[in-house]
């Protein structure tokens, strides 16, 4: 199963200048728990923003830079090869974790979307594709209010392809 996991504002912004637009500790914990032990596929810019491989996961980085390498990751040149490497692990689920270009490439291949919907309109330069309800079914939604650790209200949503 191919899944995309993302935190996106109501206008689908996910980042600006290769940085997240918010700090939501519960979302970071949710991301870790959901992806733990699974292969994660990301673009080079996303990896560079993380600055190191995600522990407890098989990290696969897509880049067009032929000579690029980093310790602790598998480097590939395209999404198809990344998916092949991830499938070879025999894990039950493969996670695409960003960034914007990789999400666009993987969106039509995805079976499931894990979306942390940040309930705010925030300016960004990187966006997640729109989720159309004629193609996707919302199967779970859990709402959380803003609090002292979370500047924005947010929801954990799970969508499955119809």
Regions found by a protein language model. Name each.
Residues 1-162:
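Enzymes that bind and transform nitrogen-containing heteroaromatic metabolites
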């Amino acid at each position: 199963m191919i899944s995309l996991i993302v935190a996106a504002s109501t206008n689908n912004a996910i980042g600006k200048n290769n940085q997240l637009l918010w700090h939501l500790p519960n979302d970071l914990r949710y991301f870790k728990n959901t992806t733990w032990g699974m292969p994660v596929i990301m673009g080079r810019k996303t990896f560079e923003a993380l600055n190191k491989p995600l522990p407890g996961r098989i990290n696969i980085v897509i880049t067009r830079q032929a000579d690029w390498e980093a310790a602790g990751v598998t480097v590939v040149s395209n999404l198809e090869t990344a998916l092949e490497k991830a499938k070879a692990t025999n894990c039950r689920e493969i996670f695409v974790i960003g960034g914007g270009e990789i999400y666009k490439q993987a969106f039509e291949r995805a079976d499931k979307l894990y979306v942390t919907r940040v309930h705010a309109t925030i300016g960004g330069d990187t966006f997640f594709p729109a989720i159309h309800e004629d193609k996707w079914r919302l199967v779970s939604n859990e709402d959380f209010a803003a609090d002292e650790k979370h500047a924005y209200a947010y929801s954990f949503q799970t969508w499955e392809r119809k």
